[in-house]
Curated annotation (Swiss-Prot):
Protein name as it appears in the record: FAD assembly factor SdhE
Entry's Gene Ontology cellular component terms: cytoplasm
Subcellular location: Cytoplasm
A matching Pfam family: Sdh5
One of the GO biological process terms: succinate metabolic process
Keywords carried by this UniProt record: Chaperone, Cytoplasm
Gene: sdhE
Organism, as annotated: Xanthomonas axonopodis pv. citri (strain 306)
Keyword GTP-binding appears in the UniProt entry: no
Family: Belongs to the SdhE FAD assembly factor family.
């Protein structure tokens, strides 16, 4: 929330104050990050879009930094590899990625 004060006498310009505390800024930063991640999760394959979106909706906010880093690694992977890993056609060679893939697959729809 932004606050504006009445214009100073004779100046004609209003004084604008920023957010009242740093918490609002960090919330905005988290919201901006979430929007960017949601865009990166758009893979062009409905199934992958739904799986990644489900993770963002259900787990991202509470996820520890290490898990978030693994999720960001997954977003850098090629779609065809992700598809094979998520559908179980191929084993993911990275143990951390494989564990997160299993967790994402287990999330309720």
């Amino acid at each position: 929330m932004w606050f504006a004060a009445a214009p100073a006498l004779g100046s004609g310009a209003a004084v604008v104050f920023g957010p009242p505390c740093g918490a609002v800024e960090s919330e905005m930063d988290e919201q901006t990050l979430l929007k960017k991640l949601r865009w990166r999760c758009r893979r062009g394959m409905r199934e992958l879009d739904q799986l990644f979106g489900r993770y963002l909706d259900q787990r991202w906010a509470q996820a520890p930094d290490a898990e978030r880093a693994v999720f960001l690694q997954l977003l850098d992977c090629e779609d065809d590899k992700l598809w094979r890993w998520f559908m179980g056609y191929e084993a993911c060679p990275d143990a951390a990625n494989a564990a997160l893939i299993a967790d994402i697959r287990a999330l309720p729809a």
